[in-house]
UniProtKB/Swiss-Prot annotation:
Function: Specifically catalyzes the cleavage of the D-lactyl ether substituent of MurNAc 6-phosphate, producing GlcNAc 6-phosphate and D-lactate.
Sequence similarity: Belongs to the GCKR-like family. MurNAc-6-P etherase subfamily.
Record-listed E.C. numbers: 4.2.1.126
Assembly behavior: Homodimer.
Name used for this protein in its record: N-acetylmuramic acid 6-phosphate etherase 2
Pathway given in the UniProt record: Amino-sugar metabolism; N-acetylmuramate degradation
Taxonomic lineage of the native organism: Bacteria, Bacillati, Bacillota, Bacilli, Lactobacillales
Single GO biological process annotation from the record: peptidoglycan turnover
Gene that encodes the chain: murQ2
Xref: PROSITE patterns: GCKR, SIS
Misc: A lyase-type mechanism (elimination/hydration) is suggested for the cleavage of the lactyl ether bond of MurNAc 6-phosphate, with the formation of an alpha,beta-unsaturated aldehyde intermediate with (E)-stereochemistry, followed by the syn addition of water to give product.
Alphabetical list of InterPro entries matching this protein: Etherase_MurQ, Glucokinase_regulatory_CS, MURQ/GCKR, SIS_dom, SIS_dom_sf
List of catalytic residues: E83, E114
UniProtKB keywords: Carbohydrate metabolism, Lyase
Amino acid sequence: MNLENLTTERRNENTMGLDEMSVKEALQKMNQEDQKVAMAVGQELAAIEPVVEAIIKSFNQGGRLIYMGAGTSGRLGVLDAAECVPTFGVEPEMVQGLIAGGQKAMTVAVEGAEDSKELGRQDLVDLKLSANDIVVGIAASGRTPYVIGGLEYATTVGAATATVACNKNAEISKYAQMPIEVDAGPEFLTGSTRLKSGTAQKLILNMLSTISMIGIGKVYNNLMVDVKPTNEKLVERSKRIIMEATGCSYEVAELKFVEAEENVKLAIVMILTDSTKEEATQKLIDGNQFIKNTLN
């Protein structure tokens, strides 16, 4: 295995002598390196766009978005998937994160898990992967066998495939229809891909899930109108979203929120179209769940 040619494994000339720096100097250096990440991601928008479009297509045909990764890459996929539930009001099955070694690997390393192609395949078999789904393999190094095994299996069942790697000409790119390769340069701490690579991956996963959810009507203007009010903070946020979307008072927002059985999107349509709960429900069905389509 030839790792020394990978950007993520090279020493960073800008951060030599870390152990001789003051805390202030080290913080400044780290911040300087982190600022390069968003710029690097920005260079890959043309590669990210078709992946978002493929995810929207998958969702529209009842498919799922499945992230796969090992270590930090896997944890980031699990994190993004978990946040889709409260943010966009989707079922947990719609966006899922698989990590080599399973749930235990979220907190401790599982020996050998990332090196098993068969484990990657089996995890997708267990999910009953179908041609309607899309699999996004995540690997900073771009060579994780667990991810490659999953991508190979996904191809055999006809699922769409994409990858997120932090090295150019990554091995996993050969196994995906839509590879994303972002080069943010060597890590602040040599080889520690939880840092810049992890940040780059998080930014890209944010884009994939968020822009895809916009594409299926989960957002009105820039408001998350399918938020699930699962705690007191989110209940209050829900009422504010209704106020922002409609220009109504807090009292009206609260009333319609209750009438709509805490369904923010429904409450907004009820107010904007002066409809009953039943009428607003039908308008959303007719409008494919987009608020803007109920206003025509």
